[in-house]
Each structure stands twice: as structure tokens, then as C-alpha cells.
Amino acid sequence: MKLGVFELTDCGGCALNLLFLYDKLLDLLEFYEIAEFHMATSKKSREKIDVALVTGTVSTQRDLEVLRDARNRSEYLIALGTCATHGSVQGVIENSKEAYRRVYGNGKPPVKLLNPKPVTDYVPVDFAIPGCPYDKEEVFQVLIDIAKGIEPVAKDYPVCLECKLNEYECVLLKKRIPCLGPVTAGGCNAKCPSYGLGCIGCRGPSLDNNVPGMFEVLKEILPDEEIARKLRTFARW
């Protein structure tokens, strides 16, 4: 099977995270031939590919062209990382041209800017793996499942469940640390709470979340505007 990794506008962390699979990369290479991945190879091709991993937001005209090319060439497209699935931090920008002007003045942008949007706003996506960055073990298992003809299953539970399964102390109730775990999609194995930190919501909203209830709980700890800021950082709740 042929695998392509396509990067749009982002910090580069999601593509780099794939390389941090280390020895497991060798396991993947038993199933996949890397057709395109600029962090790992200078090879580029126009051939059809079986699986495309797309990271980043669509923020420029070039991004949109790369995304459409990846979709047209691939049988199975995965939006990888919260930029691709929800828009993430840069998705907060509602007017990219105005944001550019505030930083750089009235000069002409070097590229055609678009308001940052997730991959899912532009093309059909076969599977989505959120996270900033995503859990590399999750993407490894998804790729192995696809190679074996098994349809991957999205996580449909909140981070809170993973805290319970790992028997972590609840940082929200026990330590009064702001935590979005009750309303954030699981799949990270409760990484932040495992270090005694509150979940920052980087995987976006969970199914059947109760954001109004979460807001009321957090009001006992934070002012309203700070709660709203936390909820808007990675996804549009």
C-alpha cells in the first residue's frame, strides 16, 4: 500500500510526531510504501495512493490545492491533528487579511490568504484523528487496521473516562484545577491529567457533551471570559 503525508499550514508538529514512532515506523513500512512525506523523503510522485494523512488548516490557496490533490489521489483520507479536524489555534482568526494587516501593515501578502478552516470544511474525510499533537499510538493503530482491512473506530467517550480507567485523581474536583476533560473527546489516554494538569481540550468536543454544565462548574474557578477563551482555543464549540 502507498502512504502520503500532506502538510498544510501548521507548526509542523503533527508531521514530526509521525517520526517519533521510532521502531514502530519499521512495522508500518511492512505494510506501506511512503509515496510522499517531505520530512522523511525528497521523493514526490503524482501516482495514486491508498492512504493520505493531511495535517494543518486550509489557510492559503496553495493549501487548498494541496488538499484537493491529496483527496483526488487517495482512496482513504485521514485528517490528522486538531488543525485538520477542527481548525485549532489559527482557526480562531475570522479575517485573515485583517490579521495580516495588524501584524505586517498594509503590504501585499506573499500568498493568497484564506480564512483558516479545517480540512473537513473542504473535502470528504474518511477518518479524523484530533489532538495537538495527536497520540502517535492512535495513528499507528489506525494505519495498521486499514492495512489489514479493518475499519478504524473513532473514540466516542470523553477524556474523563480515561482518567477513571487509569485511576487518576480528578484534578477538577480534588485540586480545583480548570479541566475540560468532561467535554473533550478521549483518545489521548488522559495525557494532561496524568501529570496533574487539567485537560486543555485539544481534541475538540466529545459526543453528547454538556458544555453549559461544564461552563457552570468552571465558573466557580474562572471568570466567564477565561472559560470562553479556553473553549475556543482548539475548536469551535
UniProtKB/Swiss-Prot annotation:
Domain of life of the organism encoding this protein: Archaea
Location in the cell: Cytoplasm
The protein's required cofactors: Ni(2+); [4Fe-4S] cluster; [3Fe-4S] cluster
Binding positions for [3Fe-4S] cluster per the UniProt entry: C188, C192, C199, C202
Enzyme Commission numbers on file: 1.12.1.5
Temperature dependence: Optimum temperature is greater than 90 degrees Celsius. Activity increases with increasing temperature from 30 degrees Celsius to 90 degrees Celsius. Has a half-life of 6 hours at 95 degrees Celsius.
Gene3D superfamilies documented for this protein: NADH:ubiquinone oxidoreductase-like, 20kDa subunit (3.40.50.700)
Keyword Cytoplasm: yes
GO terms assigned for molecular function: 3 iron, 4 sulfur cluster binding; 4 iron, 4 sulfur cluster binding; hydrogen dehydrogenase (NADP+) activity; hydrogen dehydrogenase activity; metal ion binding
Keyword ATP-binding: no
Binding site for [4Fe-4S] cluster 1: C11, C14, C83, C132
Any Pfam family hit: Oxidored_q6
Binding locations of [4Fe-4S] cluster 2: C160, C163, C170, C179
Cofactor annotation comment: Binds 1 nickel ion per subunit. Binds 2 [4Fe-4S] clusters.
Reaction catalysed by this enzyme: H2 + NADP(+) = NADPH + H(+); H2 + NAD(+) = NADH + H(+)
pH effect summary: Optimum pH is 8 for hydrogenase activity at >95 degrees Celsius.
Primary location class: cytoplasm
Name of the protein in its database record: Sulfhydrogenase 2 subunit delta
